[in-house]
């Protein structure tokens, strides 16, 4: 399934940016408390609503990071299932919609190392923030990710 991911945070950043959905302005929400950086470009998919009340989160595999507020045409290939202090907070995994990534069609095509890196980041990036926690519950394949995305689109429309 093709989607447009609006990147909020580039790979390698410890700055947690948030885009105001009404104004389009990019705000620095916080500098991560843990000495960790985002493992991939991270953002959201417009016109969706996750279980946490925000647009669906997505990470994008790219050859080079982009800037905050850049829209990346991507394909959803899997999902990291997790909850945090606010409830369900799944992270869709996508790849740039580009022939260089035709070999990545499903989560099984992604290296175990990259999946472990993503999981480690999200399970631990809030460790030093009081009152916050993350519980990871593993990876879902493309079909599960697409169902979660479809559900988030329906939630947005309701």
From Swiss-Prot:
<comment type="similarity">
    <text>Belongs to the PPase family.</text>
</comment>
<comment type="function">
    <text>Catalyzes the hydrolysis of inorganic pyrophosphate (PPi) forming two phosphate ions.</text>
</comment>
<feature type="binding site">
    <location>
        <position position="84"/>
    </location>
    <ligand>
        <name>Mg(2+) 3</name>
    </ligand>
</feature>
<feature type="binding site">
    <location>
        <position position="30"/>
    </location>
    <ligand>
        <name>substrate</name>
    </ligand>
</feature>
<feature type="binding site">
    <location>
        <position position="89"/>
    </location>
    <ligand>
        <name>Mg(2+) 3</name>
    </ligand>
</feature>
<comment type="subunit">
    <text>Homohexamer.</text>
</comment>
<protein>
    <recommendedName>
        <fullName>Inorganic pyrophosphatase</fullName>
        <ecNumber>3.6.1.1</ecNumber>
    </recommendedName>
</protein>
<dbReference type="GO" id="GO:0000287">
    <property type="term" value="F:magnesium ion binding"/>
</dbReference>
<keyword id="KW-0963">Cytoplasm</keyword>
<feature type="binding site">
    <location>
        <position position="57"/>
    </location>
    <ligand>
        <name>Mg(2+) 1</name>
    </ligand>
</feature>
<feature type="binding site">
    <location>
        <position position="16"/>
    </location>
    <ligand>
        <name>substrate</name>
    </ligand>
</feature>
<dbReference type="GO" id="GO:0004427">
    <property type="term" value="F:inorganic diphosphate phosphatase activity"/>
</dbReference>
<feature type="binding site">
    <location>
        <position position="89"/>
    </location>
    <ligand>
        <name>Mg(2+) 1</name>
    </ligand>
</feature>
<feature type="binding site">
    <location>
        <position position="42"/>
    </location>
    <ligand>
        <name>substrate</name>
    </ligand>
</feature>
<keyword id="KW-0479">Metal-binding</keyword>
<dbReference type="GO" id="GO:0006796">
    <property type="term" value="P:phosphate-containing compound metabolic process"/>
</dbReference>
<feature type="binding site">
    <location>
        <position position="52"/>
    </location>
    <ligand>
        <name>Mg(2+) 1</name>
    </ligand>
</feature>
<dbReference type="GO" id="GO:0005737">
    <property type="term" value="C:cytoplasm"/>
</dbReference>
<dbReference type="InterPro" id="IPR008162">
    <property type="entry name" value="Pyrophosphatase"/>
</dbReference>
<feature type="binding site">
    <location>
        <position position="125"/>
    </location>
    <ligand>
        <name>substrate</name>
    </ligand>
</feature>
<keyword id="KW-0460">Magnesium</keyword>
<feature type="binding site">
    <location>
        <position position="57"/>
    </location>
    <ligand>
        <name>Mg(2+) 2</name>
    </ligand>
</feature>
<keyword id="KW-0378">Hydrolase</keyword>
<dbReference type="InterPro" id="IPR036649">
    <property type="entry name" value="Pyrophosphatase_sf"/>
</dbReference>
<feature type="binding site">
    <location>
        <position position="8"/>
    </location>
    <ligand>
        <name>Mg(2+) 2</name>
    </ligand>
</feature>
<feature type="active site" description="Proton acceptor">
    <location>
        <position position="89"/>
    </location>
</feature>
<dbReference type="Pfam" id="PF00719">
    <property type="entry name" value="Pyrophosphatase"/>
</dbReference>
């Amino acid at each position: 399934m093709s989607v447009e991911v609006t990147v909020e945070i580039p790979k390698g950043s410890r700055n947690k940016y948030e885009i105001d959905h009404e104004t389009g302005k990019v705000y620095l929400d916080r500098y991560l408390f843990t000495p960790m950086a985002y493992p991939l470009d991270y953002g959201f998919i417009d016109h969706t609503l996750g279980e946490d009340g925000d647009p669906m989160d997505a990470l994008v595999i790219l050859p080079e990071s982009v800037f905050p507020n850049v829209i990346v045409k991507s394909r959803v290939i899997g999902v990291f299932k997790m909850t945090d202090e606010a409830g369900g907070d799944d992270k869709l995994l996508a790849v740039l919609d580009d022939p260089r990534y035709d070999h990545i069609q499903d989560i099984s095509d992604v290296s175990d190392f990259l999946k472990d890196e993503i999981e480690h980041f999200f399970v631990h990036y809030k460790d030093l923030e009081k009152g916050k926690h993350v519980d990871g519950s593993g990876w879902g394949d493309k079909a599960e990710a697409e169902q979660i995305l479809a559900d988030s689109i329906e939630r947005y429309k309701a």
